[in-house]
Amino acid sequence: MKKKLPLGNSFVERNQIWAAGEIAQANDILQAMDADDIEVVRFVFADQHGLTRGKTILKSAVAATLVNGCTITSTLILKDTSHRTVLPIWQAGAGLGTQRLAGAADLIMVADPSTFKRLPWAQGTGWILCDLYYPDGEPVGYSTRSVLRGALDKLNTRGLDLVSGLEIEFHLFRPIEKSLSAHDCTQPGTPLLASPLQRGYQYLTEIRYDELEPIFAEIRRALLKLELPLRSEELEFGPSQLEITFGPEAGMATADTAILARSAIKQVSRRLGYHATFMCRPHIPNTFASGWHLHQSLVDLKTGKNQMLPDNGDEALSELGQGYLSGLLKHAAAACLL
């Protein structure tokens, strides 16, 4: 007998968060957990810095968590990159002019059933990406997926959708063994001591790629088992600098791919005894800055036709494409903070 979600008077039902498609996908998750011997599911969300945070839920509680969400403290969206809460949560308005985040109030993670995966490197472990809601069912405006969804909804009202392709550069280091002491447990903690895996500055050379192929292979297998649209793996310019690229995806899918891919690469690398970092420029001599590239186009929502292509050969972009590019240039300085 197939298991069914306990939807009656649940959080997602009361607040009409899921449509029929999401309900069907969530029911499929319950069946997949039995078929794949999944023992736990990591319910996570992406914070303002792209870090995944959340809770690991045992199989017996997954069905209830899917429909009622999982509570977390609101301070998790108010932290800097050292994991310090940077806003005065014990003051009226919590520094943001809203009592909803004051006093470290609860937020609720609600899973997006379409994002469910089985983590190939962690035995019996599922993974699902969540959106954030207030206890009254209103979406949290500071939630990264809510921000993107709002922008995509505006685009869709114009009959358009975003198609984007992602390239990510990162460094892979070998940690230098050092006994962890209480003096390292500061906030932020002392930085990891690490050494490069190769000399670098031999961009796209096959021999240098082959030196890292055993590591690339494990990363590649993990990403493909996660059904991510991996397209290429490359040796970048600097020492121990790598790059991966993905095929184009529509809407929010590219952002979800970026979150899962980065987390997967870090976890797989750590289990192999290496340290992967996506920071722009590690404070290690002779390292070369990493970046990421987002290839973008606007397409017709119904036909999928690229609306940024010009009607004739006199222009590089259509009028819509030129306007879109102008907006990117106008907001480029602010976007650098991302």
PLM regions with names:
Residues 48, 238, 284:
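Positions that flank functional sites
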Residues 158-167, 229-234, 273-281, 335-338:
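Flexible, glycine/charged-enriched surface loops at secondary-structure junctions
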Residues 168, 236-244:
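Short, conserved phosphate-binding/catalytic loop or strand-edge motifs used
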Residues 243-253, 261, 266, 270-338:
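Loop-rich catalytic cores of soluble enzymes, especially ATP-dependent carboxylate-amine ligases
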